[in-house]
């Protein structure tokens, strides 16, 4: 693949880290060179070193070996999507299991199947503990969504419901308990899918992404927890736009803002649980500006990239998501 100059590649990386690809032709995107973007971002770009996160390293050691790899070829488009799949250790075909679909940020796109799992909590935490979830992690070969120009999606996004259906039909998935989650590009993809395919998910967890509310036709009917860092201008603005949209539709929601990401986790879970106990189907959590930046590796300069794991660490959030049914 032809290489650009370092400065040009850094520009492309900056776009990709926000979860997008440069688009000129509507839904059929001219994709960015993702293999270069992802490699560059992981090695020299804005991607955190999480080797000091002992909990994450324990998850990687104990949970990641339980994942296997597969692929789905879509009959409508001819496109193929590789995926990571986790089955509970005591999986039995005679039982049924909830399934969580995790979609990573733009740096997880490409051909590396390990990285989407080792980059953070989002792909592994659902396979830990007593939840007994099946976990599906699509690994798209390209960046699949554009939030810079016309807010468009590629065919990879549109085939994802069929991929989910294929996996759910192959394994013993409780179809009323399929959940979606993602960060950045994955957050936007998940929010788009939940709102345009309203029967797809029982609930979704959106972490630092955004999409125009006017392009989310069924968003008000969904069960959502939407988390963003206060200093992530685009994601925080996306929260506010969706709140305004819900208010105009007469739909109530729960919210907690100025949450200190560095506070004791039991305290954070308690505050979040108090909000969730109000019984709203849609809930917003916003970290206080600056608090997600403490303790991150020195190459991280944006709250967007620093904030992903904080939401996934909250058991109150995870338990609420898994308690929802269609």
Whereabouts are the PLM-identified features?
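Sec-dependent N-terminal signal peptides of Gram-positive bacterial secreted proteins and lipoproteins
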Residues: 4-23
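A domain-start/cap signature at the N-terminus of enzymes
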Residues: 20-97, 181, 254-260
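Gly/Ser-rich "nucleophile elbow"/oxyanion-hole loop immediately N-terminal to the catalytic nucleophile
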Residues: 90-95, 146-184
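Loop/turn elements at helix/coil->beta-strand transitions in domains of secreted/extracellular proteins
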Residues: 95-99, 130-134, 174-178, 197-203, ...
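Active-site machinery of serine-nucleophile hydrolases
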Residues: 99, 103-161
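Primarily recognizes the serine-hydrolase "nucleophile elbow" in alpha/beta-hydrolase
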Residues: 170, 176-221
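C-terminal catalytic histidine-bearing segment of alpha/beta-hydrolase fold enzymes
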Residues: 228, 232-234, 252-326
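Conserved alpha/beta-hydrolase "acid-adjacent" motif
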Residues: 234-240
């Amino acid at each position: 693949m032809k290489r650009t100059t370092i400065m040009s590649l850094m520009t492309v990386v900056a776009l990709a880290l926000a979860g997008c690809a440069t688009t000129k032709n509507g839904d059929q995107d001219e994709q960015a060179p993702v293999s270069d973007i992802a490699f560059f971002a992981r090695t020299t770009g804005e991607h955190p070193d999480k080797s000091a996160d002992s909990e994450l390293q324990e998850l990687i050691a104990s949970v990641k070996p339980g994942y296997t790899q597969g692929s789905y070829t879509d009959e409508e488009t001819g496109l193929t999507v590789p995926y990571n799949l986790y089955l509970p250790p005591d999986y039995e075909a005679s039982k049924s299991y909830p399934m969580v679909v995790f979609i990573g940020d733009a740096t997880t796109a490409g051909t590396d199947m390990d990285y989407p799992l080792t980059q953070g909590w989002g792909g592994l935490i659902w396979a830990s503990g007593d939840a007994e979830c099946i976990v599906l992690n699509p690994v798209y070969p390209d960046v699949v969504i554009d939030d810079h120009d016309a807010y468009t999606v590629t065919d990879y996004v549109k085939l994802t419901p069929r991929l989910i259906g294929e996996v759910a039909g192959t394994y013993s998935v409780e179809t009323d308990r399929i959940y979606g989650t993602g960060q950045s590009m994955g957050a936007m993809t998940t929010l788009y899918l939940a709102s345009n395919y309203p029967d797809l998910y029982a609930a979704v967890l959106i972490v630092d992404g955004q999409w125009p509310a006017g392009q989310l036709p069924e968003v008000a009917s969904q069960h959502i927890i939407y988390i963003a860092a206060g200093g992530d201008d685009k994601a925080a603005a996306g929260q506010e736009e969706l709140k305004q949209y819900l208010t105009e539709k007469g739909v109530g929601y729960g919210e907690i803002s100025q949450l200190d990401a560095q506070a004791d986790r039991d305290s954070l879970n308690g505050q979040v649980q108090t909000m969730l106990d109000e019984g709203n189907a849609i809930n917003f959590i916003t970290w206080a500006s600056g608090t997600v930046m403490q303790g991150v590796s020195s190459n991280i300069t944006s709250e967007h990239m620093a904030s992903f794991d904080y939401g996934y660490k909250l058991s109150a959030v995870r338990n609420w998501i898994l308690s929802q049914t269609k």
